[in-house]
Amino acid sequence: MAVTIVLGSQWGDEGKGKITDMLSQEATLCCRAAGGHNAGHTIVHGNVTYDFHILPSGLVSDKCINLIGAGTVVHVPSFFKELAALEAKGLKGAAARAFISDRAHVCFDLHSVVDGLEEKGLGGRKVGTTGKGIGPCYSDKASRRGVRVGEILDEEVFERKLRTLHAGYTARFGQLDYDVEEEIARFKEYRKLLVPHIVDQLAFFNKHKDSSNTLVEGANALLLDLDHGTYPFVTSSSTGLGGAVQALHLNPTSIKSIIGVVKAYTTRVGSGPFPSEQLNEAGEKLQKVGREFGVTTGRKRRCGWFDLVLLRYSQSINHYTALNLTKLDILDDFDEIKVAVAYTLPDGTRLENTIPADAEVLNKVDVEYVTLPGWKSNTMGVKKYEDLPENARKYIEYIERELGGVPVKWIGTGPARDDMICRE
């Protein structure tokens, strides 16, 4: 089994879907390792736009089998709703190629209700979650009281565990805007529908051990990782290389490439430190031209300049063998482009390749920038590297040098599926 892993290297929304879509055309197996329906990306396949949340985007290829792995949390209604939406747009037979590990955890509507209550309780210190219940679901998993997908098939165990979960949250918060018996009734129907989708993950991989090309699709991104991200303003799963290996029990020696997807500037949804954020005309321009709205929440994304400190940190943890630089065309109309190259902490310490663990300290860093000339010409739809403006090529090559020679192998030049430069 030869494995390619695609990972977000910033705060998510980097455009992982397009490279995954491209690579999935040759893949025989595509897997999600972490997260739930809080993730979101858009793929333009032909003339049709597809939104993905919990499902692997390998479903756009009719030759690709898809697995939602053990490290994920699955909101069952969203799983079926998303499948139906894909098939309604022409992806016939998608359901027959979508499988869920029996060791994944179930994200209930109950978790969404609790998510809102927990965020409300934080007041001005809100994390800025998607409100999908992901955090409470992972909390239940870590506390050993969660419900696994495989347990849905055992009606007695499932109902007992869900009622116990509900009773625990009621004891904590009081009366909830949630009816546990209604949810149990809904799952009587879901139980029958889920039977062909639920698999023993180890047996599944043994069946597909001769897969010539396995693609692992990362969700969220390294800076949202529970351990390595800007804690506590993170998601609740391991979104980096280590999380993918563990959740899908990959043999590390089978990994042939690790692709880091990075936007040509930086964005973030929700709260938390963002050193290179531009609360000015430049930030507004990036937001408007880049159409920076979250696929899952619809919220405006915060925008700022490319941050090499964050990317060096991300590279040190995920060990990218190549990069996919996305949305280069959004920078076409800037006279000059800034790149963050170092931070200075309040105590005077200068950082170039790591970030402080304390989010409060990261919020207070002074950012050092270099200024590069813009190219002031259209790169939309460019397919060959040599056809890019000279200053655009210099921008890309500067990033490569500053990252120690990690090659930028793919460059996104527009929203369409084929708006991509592939460098050999």
Swiss-Prot record:
Q: Which UniProt keywords apply?
A: Cytoplasm, GTP-binding, Ligase, Magnesium, Metal-binding, Nucleotide-binding, Purine biosynthesis
- Does Aminoacyl-tRNA synthetase show up as a keyword for this record? no
State a single Gene Ontology molecular function. Answer: GMP binding
Report the main location listed first in the record: cytoplasm
* Active site positions, chain numbering: D13, H41
Enumerate the subcellular locations listed in this protein's record, separating them with semicolons: Cytoplasm
What domain of life does the UniProt record list for this protein's source? Eukaryota
Where, by residue number, does IMP bind?
D13, E14, G15, K16, N38, A39, G40, H41, T130, R144, N220, T235, R299
GO BP field: 'de novo' AMP biosynthetic process; cellular response to cadmium ion; IMP metabolic process
Q: What is this protein called?
A: Adenylosuccinate synthetase
Q: Which reaction does it catalyse?
A: IMP + L-aspartate + GTP = N(6)-(1,2-dicarboxyethyl)-AMP + GDP + phosphate + 2 H(+)
What EC number(s) would the UniProt record show? 6.3.4.4
Entries under Pfam families matching the protein: Adenylsucc_synt (PF00709)
Cofactor: how bound: Binds 1 Mg(2+) ion per subunit.
The text of the family note is: Belongs to the adenylosuccinate synthetase family.
> What cofactor does this one take?
Mg(2+)
UniProt enzyme class: ligase
